[in-house]
């Protein structure tokens, strides 16, 4: 069982002994300890797994530091988040070498190569946490599913500066005219009225 105790959510995934992936679980959380115990209990119930059948639990993520050496009596192994991101990216992509982008509360770039230690290349604080914070401040909403529904009915060209707004030759540059050139570019002081 692998558990990522992140800044805003706890994610759990595991494989059955025959190699089949169990139904993963994603739980929003503010308290890492409560989150990990509740999420693991729910995960085992939803996947019809007994705690005795879990050999070990791999724990990673910022909140993983709050998890001890065992969880519900099962041994825990703490793993570097960037190593987890790198190995997981290679597994999912079926590549031997890749730059893996992990988009969570923030965003991290990790270089991974089979048989080698993964390397953190850098990152940004812009991620899901940014979207949640902006949604709360600007819209008074925290539920991203509602924000996503609103976004689907919106029109980016009313707020974003598009390639077509700055050049008619975007296609000559390999850019589609309807691509965003600058997020929120039409709502800045220097932008013309949209």
Predicted regions and their residues:
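Short glycine-aspartate micro-motif
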Residues: 1-4, 54-58, 98-102, 123
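Short glycine-rich, Thr/Ser-proximal phosphate-binding strand/loop in the N-terminal lobe
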Residues: 1-38, 117-118
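Short beta-strand-to-turn element immediately C-terminal to the catalytic PLP-Schiff-base lysine
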Residues: 15-16, 110-113, 137
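Flexible, glycine/proline-enriched loop segments at strand-loop-helix junctions
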Residues: 27, 75-76, 117-124, 132-137, ...
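Phosphate/pyrophosphate-binding loops at sites that engage ATP/ADP/AMP, CoA/4′-phosphopantetheine
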Residues: 40-55, 191-194
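Conserved phosphate-binding catalytic cores of ATP/NTP-utilizing and phosphoryl-transfer enzymes
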Residues: 67-101, 106, 110-119
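Active-site rim beta-loop-alpha module in soluble metabolic enzymes
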Residues: 136-194
């Amino acid at each position: 069982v692998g558990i990522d105790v992140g800044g805003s959510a706890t994610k759990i995934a595991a494989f059955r002994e025959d190699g089949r992936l169990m139904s993963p679980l994603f739980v929003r959380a503010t308290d890492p300890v409560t989150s990990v115990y509740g999420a693991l209990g729910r995960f085992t119930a939803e996947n019809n797994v007994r705690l005795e059948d879990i050999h070990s639990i791999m724990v990673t993520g910022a909140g993983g530091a709050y998890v001890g050496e065992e969880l519900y009596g099962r041994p825990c192994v703490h793993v570097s988040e960037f190593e987890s991101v790198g190995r997981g990216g290679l597994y999912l992509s079926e590549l031997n070498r890749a730059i893996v982008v992990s988009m969570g509360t923030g965003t991290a770039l990790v270089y991974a190569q089979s048989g080698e230690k993964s390397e953190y290349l850098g990152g940004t604080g812009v991620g899901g946490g940014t979207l949640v914070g902006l949604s709360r401040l600007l819209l008074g909403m925290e539920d991203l599913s509602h924000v996503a529904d609103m976004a689907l009915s919106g029109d980016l060209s009313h707020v974003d500066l598009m390639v077509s707004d700055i050049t008619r030759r975007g296609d000559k540059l390999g850019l589609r005219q309807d691509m965003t050139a600058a997020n929120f570019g039409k709502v800045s002081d220097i932008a013309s009225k949209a």
